[in-house]
């Protein structure tokens, strides 16, 4: 009976494992389409992306980090760290000690990036490996005195086709081989700000173009013979929500601009007081019922957004769809809001020898992507905030079981064991059934005559 149980569970475990061994070194391409909101997948048609998912895995929601902006979340993907830990805490920053400023047009100083070690640096430092990058934030900066062997300086006017051609050329023909590569594209974020997720007509056109680019990516990889052995992750940094001229929070109505310096604006405004901090806070805290005002030490723990000098003394967080302004104008749509909001979440899809086929998973954290990528590449991860266990179900070489599967396996196992037990009992009963009645056998003393 014990042997049967051991064999049963050995079979179950074996069924969840797959041989992913290969003589080729593992390779990984990480692709980001900026501002790709998770539910775009449900609301629009993506034939090329759906084919990609059908042969790979899909994570329906990736919970990103606060604040839900481009630079911070792209750095969280490749470091596995919260913003307070990796130091890229916003798209616009100020360091009070060095008096330095950071922005999307002034981002090349390694000072801002050196609080963490991104995966392309770790990979680049390995023997017989190199990294490549097509405009992923930070990849054109020497971080810890290391830069990828192959990279493109950021230029938004460079086409997706040119970026793709460079990346595939480097993946296909480099020495030492490129084993980790990144590719970044500004859409659908740029159009999302302009039109918004509720503009079906325009966003349908924009997202069709995105899907066509994914089709071009897959076709290019197949044409160059990279498709079968290359692991590809397609994801994003954040989503998008609709804003309105009717939902504005005008700071000039609440406080004189001479009292503070505005480091970053909506929907999370970073305030550096010029006068007493408490006075500035008191003037702002009742400014709008649609905005939370926090002293730095009171920022909710769930944001992991306190412990860094680049986080300003006062933070303003607008409600979803509301915009913090200094005048009456605003863009139609934005991101950066509370990272618990589904509208802020991106998705993740992946394909390749490291991943299952046709598997869907509900949610992971954006910081979980880093330890998963390190595992795929065989790299030792730096200390991080991610949890590798959250992504095990995506990978063919990992034992993984979620709650519904666990319940199904337990019930199935009990049914099988019950059937086996019943079968054994039936067989034992058959062997111990009494033989049919036979003629009475006389003992030796029964042969004596009854009458002497």
From Swiss-Prot:
> What glycosylation sites does the entry record?
155, 166, 276
Signal peptide region: 1-15
What cofactor does its activity depend on? Answer: Zn(2+)
- Subcellular localization(s) per the UniProt record: Cell membrane
Asked if Coiled coil is a keyword of the record, the answer is no
> Could you tell me what reaction this enzyme catalyses?
P(1),P(3)-bis(5'-adenosyl) triphosphate + H2O = AMP + ADP + 2 H(+)
The chain's Cytoplasmic topological domains, given as residue ranges, are 428-452
Identify this protein by name.
Answer: Bis(5'-adenosyl)-triphosphatase ENPP4
Q: Which gene encodes it?
A: ENPP4
